[in-house]
Amino acid sequence: MSQEFEVGHSAVPNAATTTVEKPIASPTTTTIQPPWTKRHLNLILIGDVNSGKTAFLDLLANVCAGVPLEDFKPVHKAANERDSSQPGSNTNVPEFYTISCANGTEVNILDTPGLGDPRGIEIDFQNRNAIVKAIQRHFETVNAIIILANGSLYHTMGVEFVIKTISHIFPHSIANNIAFVLTMVDDPTMIVFDRSYLPDELKDAKVWGINNPFSLWMKYQKKIAENPRTLPEDFLEEMNDSIHRDYPKTLTTLSEVFQFLDKCEVQPMESAYSLKERPDIEAPVPNVIAGMN
């Protein structure tokens, strides 16, 4: 099985482009069923710091391209990632990816730095303006915005700040094109997500929970490559079995996500403008009111 990755820098500062080609088909390839019908999908992944946006991008890129779980590999540009042990967003600048899918369609995804960066409001302000510039460069229309959040944490402040930022960038009509994906969710019935603080326009937004199999598989590969190994063999076997056992559930969830995306009416992006014109966007504070008007 072969994959080809082509990386190029955008002419716009703080934006980059990566193309992910679909692999040669394999009899063991598992894809999203039923397939979606739109030939092109434009998505924006956005969320607070450490919400798992880039890992979710890697999952989408592998699954959409028809790559079997055992062959999962990172597709994100490693040079665009900071040391995860350091505070702040791991993603340096917005990165644009084009994924050639196994069903012949194309998915364009903008991966973005985390909002609410603890390194300070200046970093956060730069990141938000870079997101706007990347949107203006790459998208005339957008199918959906996926807001990611750590589903293992009970928090509202970070997500509220993300929603407030979105409300200042996009037209009011984008509300019907917004959905949530909660990461690090072992059991979908135990999702920690409070809708009460959401603006009325998002009270009925779609919410899905996943425990990203791409992240789990990368951790498993790292553990079995250790010499000497730090985990007992039976633990590693259980880890492998668990990932494979839960993977079909993830495919079911992704199928629901793409059926939602397929039904979204495209939204024009000509009204997205620089946040420099909106100085009223502040750092995240308690009780942020994120009206979509």
Model-derived features: positions:
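Hydrophobic/aromatic hotspots within intrinsically disordered, low-complexity regions
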Residues: F5-P13, V20, I24
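PEST-like, low-complexity acidic/proline-rich intrinsically disordered segments
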Residues: M1-E6, P213
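Globular "head" domains of long coiled-coil molecular machines
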Residues: T17-T18, P23-I24, T29-K263
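Long, non-membrane, amphipathic alpha-helices that form coiled-coils
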Residues: C264-N293
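Cys/His-coordinated Zn2+-binding motifs and related Cys/His-dense segments, i.e., zinc fingers/knuckles
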Residues: V12, I32, W36, N293
